[in-house]
């Protein structure tokens, strides 16, 4: 545990930084976090590279489980900003009489666990992970925990699926007003992109030659993707669930993701509806860690070329359900190998009777400057 707590301490508040209030400020992570609100969710690197994508035997080993235990506590204290003693224990379900290779935990009543904390995060009840939501005017934000219950075959466990369904059903119908009570745009925060180029040949290569190595980041990165064959069914379930919500509540859904060291834009859509039914199009906005240099080595550049080539192919998830990478706004490529960040902004106060647009703006680093890349997501078209 000292390792995880010490790592957070040195990264979040280095001893060599200038004191607060100094004339010469330290332009570092502490200043950034002190200046900007954050919504945090863990991914594999908050535990160790590829957590959840190894074999059942490795995932259940005492060493892996102990590392997960301490990483969970450190994440709870630093990123979720809660006292360590308030973290409920994860307990495996005992009501299952058959063997399961997936981690199936008892659900947690988070509202009770955090009742004494007035600043407690709005974690969804009846799920063992940290999935939580925020309501921001006409925007609803779902921050999904994709690590607590992850395995080779599973991303979200049954209790979490139930909690997400209950939350989506309770979203207020879009009244197309601001201020108002309805939701116009739903952002689903997924640490890894839901819509991304599918690297089938690379997956087959890894499966053929073996990839069960704790330090082999290329292998576990492929297994982590929603596009991996083992997660394709659950990816389709997620997209269909959100499309159903979009239709019922008359709102737009967008995915916001990172982790893949590139900037990209994709879409998942139903092909059996009219062009005016724009609720049937989910946008995928992909950015990356703002301090991470993007694909700089020769091997990474070759991988970037492969990504752009594979991205041209449309992915068929079902007869009338497809996923597709789009040419990056203002570019002739599908993915941008550049350090970047993404801003999302509402067009509030406009006279559009359908509601507010959601603007996505990527700022991409070049050798000497930055480039802007804008994309607008229209509100759901009004049907009179």
Show which residues each predicted segment covers.
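Metal-dependent phosphoester/phosphodiester hydrolase catalytic core
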Residues: 1-384
């Amino acid at each position: 545990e000292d390792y995880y707590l010490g790592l957070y301490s040195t990264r979040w508040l280095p001893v060599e930084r200038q004191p607060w209030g100094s004339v010469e400020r330290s332009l570092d992570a502490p200043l950034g976090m002190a200046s900007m609100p954050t919504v945090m969710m863990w991914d594999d690197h908050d535990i160790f590279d590829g957590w959840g994508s190894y074999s059942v035997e490795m995932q259940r080993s005492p060493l892996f489980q102990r590392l997960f235990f301490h990483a969970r506590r450190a994440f709870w204290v630093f990123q979720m900003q809660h006292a360590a003693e308030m973290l409920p224990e994860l307990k495996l379900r005992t009501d299952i009489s058959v063997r399961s290779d997936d981690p199936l935990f008892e659900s947690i009543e988070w509202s009770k666990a955090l009742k004494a904390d007035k600043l407690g995060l709005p974690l969804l009840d009846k799920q063992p992970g940290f999935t939580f939501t925020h309501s921001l005017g006409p925007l609803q934000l779902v921050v999904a925990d994709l690590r607590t219950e992850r395995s080779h075959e599973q991303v979200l466990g049954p209790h979490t699926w139930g909690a997400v369904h209950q939350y989506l059903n309770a979203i207020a119908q879009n009244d197309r007003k601001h201020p108002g009570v309805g939701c116009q745009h739903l952002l689903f925060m997924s640490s890894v992109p839901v819509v991304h180029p599918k690297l089938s040949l690379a997956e087959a290569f890894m499966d053929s030659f073996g990839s069960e190595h704790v330090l082999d980041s290329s292998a576990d990165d492929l297994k982590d993707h929603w596009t991996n064959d083992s997660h394709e069914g659950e990816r389709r379930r997620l997209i269909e669930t959100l499309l159903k919500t979009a239709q019922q509540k008359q709102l737009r859904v967008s995915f916001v993701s990172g982790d893949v060291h590139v900037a990209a834009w994709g879409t998942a859509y139903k092909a059996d509806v009219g062009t005016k039914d724009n609720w049937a199009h989910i946008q995928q906005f992909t950015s990356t860690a703002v301090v991470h240099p993007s694909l700089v080595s020769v091997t990474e550049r070759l991988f970037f070329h492969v990504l752009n080539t594979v991205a041209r192919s449309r992915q068929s998830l079902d007869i009338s359900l497809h996923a597709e990478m789009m040419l990056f706004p203002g570019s002739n490529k599908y993915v941008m190998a550049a350090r970047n960040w993404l801003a999302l902004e509402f067009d509030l106060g406009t006279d559009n009777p359908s509601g507010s647009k959601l603007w996505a703006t990527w700022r991409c680093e070049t050798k000497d400057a930055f480039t802007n890349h804008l994309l607008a997501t229209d509100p759901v078209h009004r049907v009179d």
